[in-house]
Amino acid sequence: MTRNSIRFLLFLIPFCAALSTRALPQEIANDEELQAQLAAGKKFLGQTADRGAVLFFLAATYAQLKEPHEAVTTLKECVALKEGFDPAGDPAFAGLRQSKDFQTLTEQVHRDFPPISTAQPAFLSSEKGLIPEGLAYDAAQDVFYLSSLHLKKIVAISRLGEFADFVSADRYKLLPVLGIRVDAYDDSVWSASWLDNGRTELLHFDNRGKLLGRFSLPEDGRKHGFNDLVVLRAGDVFVTDTADNHVYRFEAKAQAFHEIKLARALLAPNGIALSDDESAVYVADQLGVLRVDLKSGQSAEVNPGPHCTLAGADGLYWHAEKLIAVQNGIGSPRIAVFQLSGDGLHVTKTTVVEYRSKFTVLPTTGALAGDDFYFIVNSQIDNLNGDRVLDNTKLQPVRIAKLRIP
């Protein structure tokens, strides 16, 4: 996940980071923590393919430090790149909203990037307290799976829009459930779970919801947080660890985790995608997307090119040489489709398919069903602190929408 301001100390308040750069109105960071975050962010300048993403992160940190001049100055540089960052949609900038300079910047962004809507309603839950994070599709059974952070369960959704528990809340005493994917080989279901005290598990269920295994990293004294994952045909799983800024490969036969070495340090890794031929895995973090060659083990950052950003992708998916991203870490959320070059290392075309519409309330992830992309419209993760609902009166039925991939 990713939202409620990029900050929340992606280094120091892991669950908040996981739940996205705009996710939770949780604990207020002190100046010492924010200064540490600022220093860490500055180290990424010149080290990534997307300068705008680093600038947006720094501007938000300055805003939280109540340094309006530095925040606006940094935002001006970011907005001038015309990549799509929209500070109006990020709570970190709440203290600047009465500033004329800030208003001028957001007006410019909205002129450059007008609202777009191509989606239509798909499903609506009757249950209000789900607060979902992950969505997956099982083509063999023609069923969707929705993970619940608050109720700590997994729900199955039929094509008719019928919701039923796949793994009930009290069955296995699960942690909050995040990313979820289906193993196409045997229709089993894998999911990531994570509580903000640093407890995290990789879960494996059969296609009837029976728990086949739950796996944790060896104790190392650090806080970890599994977030999203992909499943290879051989049964191995790649999973992002948002809290500790790493990616792991879980070897299913040996039941062992192996850390993946990447070309640069990560900042809250989140969404992850697997190419159809399983030649590459794409890892999203707050600053962009890295491609990992599964044969050589080498990695490199995907270059978005000018006037484009791959940053802040909570959900990331591969479809016909394209990446589909649910970007809720760039201010106002959007869903975008990125056509890639033959080597998978450059964006050749960007198509924003949903932005500043009634379907981008607070999206987190989605799932592909053929050429249609289904996604969570209103996750409500901003009403959750850890596994506690902040205001029960604000809970709403979960809306899921769909759109056709261009």
Show which residues each predicted segment covers.
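Beta-strand-rich domains and repeat architectures in extracellular enzymes and scaffolds
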Residues: 114-117, 121-155, 396
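Asp-box/WD-like beta-propeller blade repeats and closely related beta-sheet repeat scaffolds
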Residues: 111, 115-120, 199-236, 240
